[in-house]
Amino acid sequence: MEKREKILHSVINIIIVILVVIGLYMTMTYRSEYMEFQMRGTVSLRYYTVQSNLFAGVVALLALFYQGKATKVLKLMSATATGLTFAVVLFFLGPLYGHWRMYKRANLFFHLSVPLLSMIEFVLLTDVPRKWKWKVLSAVPTLVYGLVYVLNILINGIGERYPNYNDFYLFLRWGWGVALLIFAGIVLISFGIACLLSGINTKVGKLRRKEPCPSQ
């Protein structure tokens, strides 16, 4: 990685960490002016959006001090997780509820800024070996989240009423069959995002290696 790339890498990761901290503060406080279309307080930690952004923040912080192979793979995983959040909001929740609502206040960071920065930083500045296992591994957090979600409902029941409701994504309104299909589809989409990001990363990496050296 060249000096300018190292500087850009550090700057982007610092920005990611700062935005995650700000977004988490807004999410965890009970100040209604900070929130729009989002749960407040510790209950918000159960949501995939918050967890994926926290993961991205931790990985970005780690990348500031260590840039080994493990960190690069974690970069793909965090870009995939936040990329899934970005895609769901852009193509499903945004058209359904209005993009202006989905990108207000704390959601601007967790639905847009952090996911975009995570994906851009991975695609442009991270070199990851072309191995299928890393792409599969990048879908594992989504798989684990879904399994815990389902197991919690099976063990503790659906719950009484929202927001004290274990099926807080309301997948079971259509029955278990449809809910499991949605779950499987989301995991596959997550894997697809990992493949897409990895593919673009590979192409960008080839272009970077072909860049002519500046004349002396």
What does each of the following model-derived ranges do?
Residues 156-200:
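Membrane-interface transmembrane-helix boundary segments in multi-pass integral membrane proteins
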Residues 8-24, 138, 144:
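Alpha-helical transmembrane segments
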Residues 115-132:
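Alpha-helical transmembrane segments in multipass membrane proteins, preferentially the mid-helix core
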Residues 38-47, 99-111, 133-134:
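Non-cytosolic membrane-interface motifs at loop->transmembrane helix junctions
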Residues 105-116, 183-185:
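Membrane-interface loop-to-helix entry segments
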Residues 62, 69-81, 131-140:
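Interfacial segments of alpha-helical transmembrane regions
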Residues 27-37, 90-100, 154-155:
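Juxtamembrane "helix-exit" motif on the non-cytosolic side of transmembrane helices
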